[in-house]
From Swiss-Prot:
Protein's name in the database: 4,4'-diaponeurosporene oxygenase
Family membership noted in the UniProt record: Belongs to the carotenoid/retinoid oxidoreductase family. CrtP subfamily.
Gene name of the record: crtP
GO biological process, one term: carotenoid biosynthetic process
Record GO terms (molecular function): oxidoreductase activity
Reactions catalysed according to its record: all-trans-4,4'-diaponeurosporene + 2 AH2 + 2 O2 = 4,4'-diaponeurosporenal + 2 A + 3 H2O
Keywords: Carotenoid biosynthesis, FAD, Flavoprotein, Oxidoreductase, Virulence
Amino-acid positions noted as binding FAD in the UniProt annotation, renumbered to this chain: V7, I8, G9, G10, G11, L12, G13, G14, I15, S16, A17, A18, I19
Length: 497
C-alpha cells in the first residue's frame, strides 16, 4: 500500500519536500494556512508598485533546478531568472561607497578606492571561504549531517576542527585576513542571510561569501514569488494534493509516534509520516503541546534569530545612485549587533538593507517612480514587546538615516507605504516570536547548528525550513526539504530489507 505523507506548511522547505516525496512514489498532502504557496516568499502589489514581501535574493539556483531535473523537466520552462554581475552597493556614513561584483577582479576594477593590498586580501579571504564551502558541501549539504558529532564522525576530529574553523567567530576570521574597515563590515554583513551576528556566529558561515561569489546572485523576473509558483506547479504535476487556506490545529500521537493531523475544521487525516514546515518550537508548542520543561530546554539552546522592520515604499522619484541591492551601513557595527542580539533593543544606528528591483525590472513601479523595500534587522518579539510608538520613532530614525546618506527628501516623495513588524511576521507565518530566519547561529550556544531534521521526541516526524539544518535562506530551506525526503527514502529502503 502506498504510504501517505502529510506536509504542514507550504513554504519552500515544505513544497520541496512534497515534490521529492511525490517523485519517490508516495501519496502526499500539503496543508497551508495561507492562500498562497511559498511561505515568506510572498507578494504585495498596490498602486502600480510590486514588492517581494520576504526574501529578495536568489542564490544557488542549482538546488531548485535539481527538483525539476528529478522529473526530467527544466526549471527555465517554468520561471525566468537573471544573473546580476553587480551584486550590491554598500554605502558608508562617511560617504564612501563600495560595489561588490561577481569576481574579485571585477570588484577591483569597479572600485578605485580599493588598493592592491585590499584586492589581494579579498582574494585570500575568498580562498579561505572556498575551502570551508567545499568541506561543508561534502557532508553538511550532500549528506544532510545535523550535529557536531555527525560532522566529526564523517570528516574525522582534526579535519573537522581545522577545516570548519570552529576556533573562530565569523568576524574574527574576517578581521584576521582583511585590514580594510569598509570591507570588514561589508563581509561581516553576509551574516544577514541567517539573521545573526558576525561577532557571535561561527567562522564556518564565512562560506556564504564564496557561495555567492561562485554561484552568483540572481533575480527572478517579475518577483521571487514566481519561483514559488513554479514549484507549486511542479508539485501539482507530480500529484501532490495541495490544500490552501487549511490550518492544522493538532498533530496526533500514539506511544511517541505521530499518527496524523487534525484540521481546524475538526477533520482527522491519517499519515505514515509528517513533515512540518512550521518552525520546530512552535510545532512542539502549539501542535503537539510538548511539556514545559522540554520546551524551556529547547528555547535556551535555540534562541530565535533576528526579525525585521520591513518598509515597502512607493516613491514618486528616482534615485540614480541606488543599485538593485544596497546596504546602508552603521557607524559602529559591533554596537549594532550588540543592541539587536544582546541588549534586545531597537538599534540607534541600524544597518539597512534596501532593495530596488525596479533598477532591473521596470515592471515593478510606474514610469518615473521606484519601489523601495527597506529592511533593518531588529530583535525578535520580547516578553515586553515594542510599542506602536517605539516603531514610529524607529521609522523616523530609518528615514533620517537614508536621507542623510543620500536619498534626498525621501519622506516627501513617499506616495505609498506598507509596513511589516515582527508581530505581522509571527501572525502570518506562525514563526517563533516573529523571527525571520529561524534560530540564531551562535558559536557558544549551538556551534551554528540549527535543529536536526528528525524529531528527537516522536517517530516519523520530520522538520524542514529555516529552523533546521542546513539553515535559513531560500536555497537552504529548499535543500532541507530534499534532505528530509532522502532520510525518509533511506529509512523506507532499510525497512524493506
Amino acid at each position: 500500500m502506498t504510504k501517505h505523507i502529510i506536509v504542514i506548511g507550504g513554504g519552500l522547505g515544505g513544497i520541496s519536500a512534497a515534490i521529492r516525496m511525490a517523485q519517490s512514489g508516495y501519496s502526499v498532502s500539503l496543508y497551508e494556512q495561507n492562500n498562497h504557496i511559498g511561505g515568506k516568499v510572498n507578494r504585495h502589489e498596490s498602486d502600480g508598485f510590486g514588492f517581494d514581501l520576504g526574501p529578495s535574493i536568489l542564490t544557488m539556483p542549482y538546488i531548485f533546478e535539481k527538483l525539476f531535473e528529478y522529473s526530467k523537466k527544466q526549471m527555465s520552462d517554468y520561471v525566468t531568472i537573471k544573473r546580476l554581475p553587480h551584486q550590491w552597493r554598500s554605502f558608508f556614513p562617511d560617504g564612501t561607497t563600495i560595489d561588490l561584483y561577481e569576481g574579485i577582479k571585477e570588484t577591483g576594477q569597479h572600485n578605485a578606492i580599493l588598493s592592491k593590498q585590499d584586492i589581494e586580501e579579498l582574494q585570500n579571504y575568498l580562498n579561505y571561504t572556498r575551502r570551508i564551502d567545499r568541506i561543508t558541501e561534502k557532508g553538511y549539504f550532500n549528506y544532510g549531517l545535523d550535529t557536531l558529532s555527525q560532522i566529526i564522525k564523517f570528516h574525522g576530529p582534526l579535519n573537522a576542527l581545522i577545516n570548519y574553523d570552529y576556533v573562530h567567530t565569523m568576524q574574527q576570521a574576517i578581521d584576521k585576513r582583511i585590514s580594510n574597515p569598509y570591507l570588514r563590515q561589508m563581509l561581516g554583513y553576509f551574516i544577514k542571510y541567517v539573521g545573526s551576528s558576525s561577532y557571535d556566529a561561527p567562522a564556518v558561515l564565512s562560506m556564504l561569501f564564496h557561495m555567492q561569489q561562485e554561484q552568483g546572485l540572481w533575480y527572478v523576473e517579475g518577483g521571487i514569488h514566481h519561483l514559488a509558483n513554479a514549484l507549486e506547479k511542479l508539485a501539482r504535476e507530480e500529484g501532490v494534493t495541495i490544500h490552501t487556506g487549511a490550518r492544522v490545529d493538532n498533530i496526533k500521537t500514539y506511544q511517541r509516534r505521530v499518527t496524523g493531523v487534525r484540521l481546524d475544521t475538526g477533520e482527522f487525516v491519517k499519515a505514515d509520516y509528517i513533515i512540518s514546515n512550521m518552525e520546530v518550537i512552535p510545532t512542539y508548542k502549539y501542535l503537539i503541546h510538548l511539556d514545559t520543561q522540554r520546551l524551556n530546554k529547547l528555547e535556551r539552546e535555540f534562541e530565535p534569530a533576528s526579525s525585521g522592520y520591513v518598509m515597502h515604499l512607493g516613491v514618486a522619484c528616482q534615485y540614480p545612485q541606488l543599485a538593485h541591492h544596497n546596504f546602508f551601513f552603521t557607524e559602529n557595527a559591533y554596537l549594532n549587533y550588540q543592541q539587536v542580539f544582546h541588549e534586545k533593543v531597537l538599534p540607534d544606528d541600524p544597518t539597512i538593507y534596501l532593495v530596488n528591483t525596479n533598477k532591473t525590472d521596470h515592471t515593478q513601479a510606474p514610469v518615473g517612480y521606484e519601489n523601495i523595500k527597506v529592511l533593518p534587522h531588529i530583535p525578535y518579539i520580547q516578553d515586553q514587546p515594542f510599542t506602536t510608538e517605539d516603531y514610529a520613532k524607529f521609522r523616523d530614525k530609518i528615514l533620517d538615516k537614508l536621507e542623510k546618506m543620500g536619498l534626498t527628501d525621501l519622506r516627501k516623495h513617499i506616495i505609498y507605504e506598507d509596513v511589516w513588524t515582527p508581530e505581522d511576521i509571527e501572525k502570518n507565518y506562525r514563526s517563533n516570536r516573529g523571527a525571520i530566519y529561524g534560530f540564531v547561529a551562535d558559536k557558544k550556544k549551538n556551534k551554528g547548528f540549527k535543529f536536526p531534521k528528525e524529531s528527537q521526541y516522536f517517530e516519523n516526524l520530520y522538520f524542514v525550513g529555516g529552523s533546521v539544518n542546513p539553515g535559513g535562506g531560500i536555497p537552504m530551506v529548499t535543500l532541507s526539504g530534499q534532505q528530509v525526503a532522502d532520510k525518509i527514502n533511506a529509512r523506507e529502503a532499510k525497512n524493506r530489507k
